[in-house]
């Protein structure tokens, strides 16, 4: 049961960070969303909000990075799958929930959030760069193309949330597909 409560709190924190950002999410919000009893906060996270934030972002980042690292898709397919995931998520949440890593990295996020987010982005970048080099793209171009894809998709997520439309993300996905196709041809 304790593990279930802890996991529910982490999952709720990630969802709330995606929706509100790290700074605008309180312990009370996480408790309400997870249904966890008030006394469970410091039982599961004795380091307080810093620990909750750090672990939640590390968990979210680890999930995304692991999907990239385990992928047997080529680089173009990896990028397309990443964009399509957020298209579905934006539609599912009525544009309320974006990327938890971005939420942690921006808006004055503290080191307990920004550090794990930076690590996850680095893992994603590394996995995509590796896929590109295995497909014959030389460095430093492979690294640049990975940066372009991650930056473009993250920016398109912001635009899509702002406009309440997946069009920016779809346009970005299509342009990245063309760029990657020309490089990988």
Ranges and model annotations:
Residues 1-3:
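N-terminal intrinsically disordered/low-complexity leader segments
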Residues 8, 81, 85, 100-103, ...:
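Amphipathic alpha-helical interaction segments
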Residues 8, 12-55:
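Helix-turn-helix
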Residues 53, 81, 92-112:
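Amphipathic alpha-helical segments used for helix-helix packing
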Residues 57-63:
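Short, basic, alpha-helical segments at the C-terminal edge of helix-turn-helix-like DNA-binding modules
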Residues 66-97, 146-149:
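Hydrophobic alpha-helical connector segments
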Residues 69, 80-81, 110-135, 144-147, ...:
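Amphipathic alpha-helical packing segments from all-alpha helical-bundle domains
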Residues 106-107, 150-167, 180-185:
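Amphipathic C-terminal alpha-helical segment
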